């Protein structure tokens, strides 16, 4: 019953948005624009330690830009990662909880402000707790290869995600966002974990793709979606952090393979070299192009559209303006 009520909140938001809600954009790279140093295994999560107010500021920027869903700064925030920095388990769990609290505080403050303005066009945003892949924790680019090694089993992946999931759920987000999943094994681990923990919060699972056809592991999306399609916990499935030029084909593909809502939030088109820890020169798409893409993606059936790495509040504003134009 609780899961159904929370899923209904998301469904109502999508309806208010005219059939497609706007997810926020690149978080770590926006922190970087404001001077944060993110060349760190913890990536954006390092700001949870060093500058939490900056995290709240970035959430506010995306809300002002028209985001209907804000995603927490916990993508690369893991208990093992924090422990490796010398933090205690209690401190690590507190930082995970803080990632949700900062997003909720920003959402509530923004909504209190705009609610006093007659005729505003904003919706009360939902907060999605980000859960990055095992590869994101490894910080070696393996979320873009899907190859975790023979020693990484289904149970190991569930054990890796379990306590982080528990802490984030206890913090009370509206949604859960499993992001940049590179293979079927980890997707299945996420689904089984939600069921084992009896989680009553709707989730989406996003894969990535390096060729616009398959998961990074080489598995077909038909294979990858099989465990997701059977789960009541999974509200939406889709793609994040893939180049925009892949998205149209992938929406068409997913629409044939699932009855779940489809969520897409690509990067700017630039390519991240996980080993060299740098962005590589490549085709980059601007706000005008994202605005044009968003209409096409919505018309193809996407229910949630946003941006990932190297997209900005300006990008999200362009998407929001286009999708909410009557």
Swiss-Prot record:
Its cofactor is Zn(2+). SUPFAM superfamilies: Homocysteine S-methyltransferase. One of its GO terms (molecular function) is S-adenosylmethionine-homocysteine S-methyltransferase activity. Zn(2+) binds at residues 241, 308-309. Coiled coil: none annotated. Its EC number is 2.1.1.10. It is an enzyme of class 2 (transferase). It catalyses: S-methyl-L-methionine + L-homocysteine = 2 L-methionine + H(+). Keywords: Amino-acid biosynthesis, Metal-binding, Methionine biosynthesis, Methyltransferase, S-adenosyl-L-methionine, Transferase, Zinc. Strongly inhibited by methionine. Expressed predominantly in roots. Expressed in rosette leaves, cauline leaves and developing seeds. InterPro entries: Betaine-hCys_S-MeTrfase_BHMT, HCY_dom, HCY_dom_sf, Hcy_S-methyltransferase. The keyword Metal-binding applies. Residues 9-323 form the Hcy-binding domain. GO terms for biological process: methionine biosynthetic process; methylation. Monomer. Catalyzes methyl transfer from S-methylmethionine (SMM) to adenosyl-L-homocysteine (AdoMet). SMM degradation (by HMT-1, HMT-2 and HMT-3) and biosynthesis (by MMT1) constitute the SMM cycle in plants, which is probably required to achieve short term control of AdoMet level. This is Homocysteine S-methyltransferase 1.
């Amino acid at each position: 019953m609780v899961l159904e009520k929370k899923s209904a909140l998301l469904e109502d938001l999508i309806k208010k948005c005219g059939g497609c809600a706007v997810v926020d954009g690149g978080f770590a790279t926006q922190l970087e624009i404001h001077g944060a140093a993110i060349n760190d295994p913890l990536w954006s999560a390092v700001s949870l330690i060093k500058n939490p107010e900056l995290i709240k500021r970035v959430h506010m920027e995306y809300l002002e830009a028209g985001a209907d869903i804000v995603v927490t700064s916990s993508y690369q925030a893991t208990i093992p990662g924090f422990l490796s920095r010398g933090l205690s388990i209690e401190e690590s769990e507190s930082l995970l909880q803080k990632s949700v609290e900062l997003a909720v505080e920003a959402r509530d403050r923004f909504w209190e402000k705009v609610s006093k303005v007659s005729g505003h066009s904003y919706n009360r945003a939902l907060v999605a707790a980000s859960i990055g892949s095992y590869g994101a924790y490894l910080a070696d680019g393996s979320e873009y290869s899907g190859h975790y090694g023979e020693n990484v089993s289904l149970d190991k992946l569930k054990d890796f995600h379990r306590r982080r999931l528990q802490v984030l759920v206890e913090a009370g987000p509206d949604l859960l966002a499993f992001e940049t999943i590179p293979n079927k094994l980890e997707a299945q681990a996420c689904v089984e974990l939600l069921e084992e923990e009896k989680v009553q919060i709707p989730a989406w699972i996003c894969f990535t793709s390096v060729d616009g056809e398959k998961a990074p592991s080489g598995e077909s999306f038909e294979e990858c979606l099989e465990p997701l399609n059977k789960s009541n916990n999974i509200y939406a499935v889709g793609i994040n952090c893939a180049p925009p030029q892949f998205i149209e084909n992938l929406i068409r593909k997913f629409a044939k393979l699932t009855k779940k809502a489809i969520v897409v939030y690509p990067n700017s088109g630039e390519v991240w070299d996980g080993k060299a820890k740098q962005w590589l020169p490549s085709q980059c798409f601007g706000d005008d192009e994202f605005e044009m893409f968003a209409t096409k993606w919505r018309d193809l059936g996407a229910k949630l559209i946003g941006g990932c790495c190297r997209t900005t509040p300006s990008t999200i504003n362009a998407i929001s303006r286009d999708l909410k134009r009557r």
